[in-house]
UniProtKB/Swiss-Prot annotation:
Pfam families: ATS3. This is Embryo-specific protein ATS3A. Residues 48-158 form the PLAT domain. It is found in: Secreted. Interacts with EULS3 (via N-terminus). It comes from Arabidopsis thaliana. Residues 1-22 form the signal peptide. Keywords: Secreted, Signal. It comes from the Eukaryota.
Length: 179
């Protein structure tokens, strides 16, 4: 009986570890940051590809012509910055829709901060932002509020490690639910 129990316990432990590290869900509230300045692009950094999916809330304005910028990174100072994600002629960020972007940037460890910047008069309410990459765990940041104008707004869950500071915890959830 003991021979069977030990391998079964090890299998369960390995399975839990595998699934618990598969996805991160950020459960804190987004905050404004006054002193955030995106970093310039690093010249000789290895390039990795990231998929960013931004879901606009169903309680947002029908669409926005506002300029939307994004910046995300890891605890080691690697950062991806896109000055303008939106394309006013294609009606991006429509109410109840998702917009997907393929973005290249420096290779990083797991993403622990993400900020959005909205500039304009239309307004916009993102529901969530999901980031995928071959070298990182997928992560979802939940906004679900109207972004203020001309203020970087988002999350820093780096827990004070490395070059970034945070007072917000990260919550990793064991889940195999579709994202």
């Amino acid at each position: 009986m003991l021979r069977l129990a030990i391998p079964l316990f090890l299998f369960a432990l390995c399975s839990f570890t595998l699934f618990s590290s598969a996805r991160s869900f950020i459960t804190t509230k987004p905050l404004p940051i006054d002193s955030f300045i995106p970093k310039p692009k690093l010249e000789n950094a290895a390039a990795c590809s990231y998929t960013v999916i931004i879901k606009t809330s169903c309680s947002s304005v029908s669409y926005t012509r506002d300029k939307i910028s994004i910046s995300f990174g890891d605890v080691y100072g690697n950062e991806v910055y896109v000055k303008r994600l939106d394309d006013p002629s294609s009606r991006t960020f429509e109410k109840c829709s998702s917009d997907t972007y393929k973005i290249s940037g420096p290779c990083m460890r797991d993403v622990c901060y993400l900020y959005l910047l909205r500039q304009g008069s239309d307004g916009w309410k993102p529901e969530n932002v999901k980031i995928y990459g071959s070298s990182i765990r997928s992560v979802t940041f939940y906004y679900n509020l109207f972004l203020p104008n001309s203020v970087w707004y988002g999350f820093n869950v780096c827990n004070g490690i490395g070059n970034t500071k945070s007072s917000q915890p990260i919550s990793t959830t064991s889940s195999v639910a579709a994202m």
